[in-house]
Amino acid sequence: MTYRDAGVDIDAGNALVERIKPLVKRSFRPEVMGGLGGFGALFDLSGKYKEPVLVSGTDGVGTKLKLAQQLGRHDTIGIDLVGMCVNDVLVQGAEPLFFLDYFATGKLDVDTAAAVVGGIARGCELSGCALIGGETAEMPDMYPPGEYDLAGFTVGAVEKSQLLDGAQVREGDVLIGIASSGPHSNGYSLIRKIYERAGAPAEHVLDDGTKLIDALMAPTALYVKPVLALLKSHGEAIHAMAHITGGGLTENIIRVIPEGLGLEIDATAWTLPPVFAWLQREGAVADAEMWRTFNCGIGFVLVAAPAQAAALEQALDAQSLAHWRIGQVVTAHGDERVRIG
């Protein structure tokens, strides 16, 4: 017997590496040392930082991956993977430096894997983050035919003096919400159930003219470049930041708010995007469940000094980023630290 007889095709793996090399190299930064194929990837951190603090993050894309596989949409799920990781490390003020991915499947389909990794490389390129390595694991009998799993890992850096940890947050600080591109990569176990039970046709169109499937599969917004620009120009105005992921608005912003303080969020400050309105209507989802499951149109939040909030908003306007003042930091009353109304 051979390894191929057992279900592992080394030649297919080598073909994949050759296919993705030019895509991966487009994401490289000057600090990357060497190319693909080494036992370890190298990144030169010297020269750019005085007191660097490394910030790491790892994530997947949840069961959005299941929907992507059902629809045969493999080219953007990699952008989701990058977004889930780099947006997280950005919260602490870190610039994502490099990224690694893990792709696992029962039988390697080179075309599918190349499409996925192409999306990862594109997400890294858009975030200024180098895709310096990864693992492609072909594991017979571990996954049903046509299915695969994904995970990502990123490392960023921030000057120690510029690290955002929420310590500067004060009562009266303003919450500025930046628009999401859709559900991003959270809440998809509920989304898939609603989609299946609604029986909506593949061509169903939402109130804004977008196809439902396109809205559900829209890749996660990448906030790295615009937010890093804000930190450079208005860093003193930003006291904390939050990436709105699993747990929604209810559970994510509060993670960067010190004890003794709470949040008041004005749900009338922005309009619920059509894809979320459809999900709530078709799934009979209560308001409270919407807030703690989905981002509801707000993908990233800046906690800002009130006197400088207007300047931040002008800077967001200059970058053509949709945004709203969605609330403020208040004194907490009892166990209820987040009020949405």
Swiss-Prot record:
The keyword Ligase applies. It catalyses: 2-formamido-N(1)-(5-O-phospho-beta-D-ribosyl)acetamidine + ATP = 5-amino-1-(5-phospho-beta-D-ribosyl)imidazole + ADP + phosphate + H(+). GO terms for cellular component: cytosol. Keywords: ATP-binding, Cytoplasm, Ligase, Nucleotide-binding, Purine biosynthesis. This is Phosphoribosylformylglycinamidine cyclo-ligase. Transmembrane segments: none annotated. One of its GO terms (molecular function) is ATP binding. Pfam families: AIRS (PF00586), AIRS_C (PF02769). GO terms for biological process: 'de novo' IMP biosynthetic process; adenine biosynthetic process. The keyword ATP-binding applies. It is found in: Cytoplasm. Belongs to the AIR synthase family. Its EC number is 6.3.3.1. It comes from the Bacteria. InterPro entries: PurM-like_C_dom (IPR010918), PurM-like_C_sf (IPR036676), PurM-like_N (IPR016188), PurM-like_N_sf (IPR036921), PurM_cligase (IPR004733). It comes from Xanthomonas axonopodis pv. citri (strain 306). Pathway: Purine metabolism; IMP biosynthesis via de novo pathway; 5-amino-1-(5-phospho-D-ribosyl)imidazole from N(2)-formyl-N(1)-(5-phospho-D-ribosyl)glycinamide: step 2/2.
